Amino acid sequence: MYPFIRMAKERVVNRSKQSISVGEIHESYHICWPWDLDFWFELNNGRALTLYDLGRIPFSGRSGFSKVILKNKWSMTMAGANVRYRKRLRAFERIRMQTRTVCWDKRFLYIEQSMWNTKKECAGHIVYRAAFVGADGIINPQRIFDEIEKNLLSPIMLSLIHISE
């Protein structure tokens, strides 16, 4: 079952935060609960993807994506992901998550997310390839960025994806 209570918490916590620009980091905090664990008593890989959702959805609101998507009756879908699990996250461990826009091309937006444990080690990292979709199919992300901020161009795609502390 999708964690609706956690989503409600994220909406309440983030509704009064100021908006962020492209490339700025949205930071959120989560806890690894016992029901998030697998047989080895660490964060289940599938639940980790759900936690990334919980970081990405408020990010979409703060960055202006949600407003443009709702106004135009579009949607945003994840078209691919490259994930790395680096360190174990155990029960009741506090997780700091960072989310940011990396770049975009004519079809996709690339979003980077990372999870950090209490020792300030990167516990997990993912890069999503997201598509904005309308009635006629995939929408060029530049249209979304033009509505958020005029004349905004994508950063250079190569060598931008990194983990920062």
What residues fall within each predicted segment?
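N-terminal leader/capping segments at the start of a protein or of a new domain
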Residues: 1-39
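Early exported N-terminus immediately downstream of N-terminal targeting peptides
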Residues: 28-35, 45-57
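Hydrophobic beta-strand-centered segment that forms part of the acyl-chain substrate-binding groove
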Residues: 59-103, 125-131
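Short aromatic-glycine-enriched beta-strand elements
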Residues: 108-112
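Core beta-strand residues in small-molecule sensory/regulatory alpha/beta domains
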Residues: 114-117
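Residue-level signal for glycine
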Residues: 120-124
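Conserved small/polar residues in nucleotide/adenosyl-binding loops
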Residues: 161-165
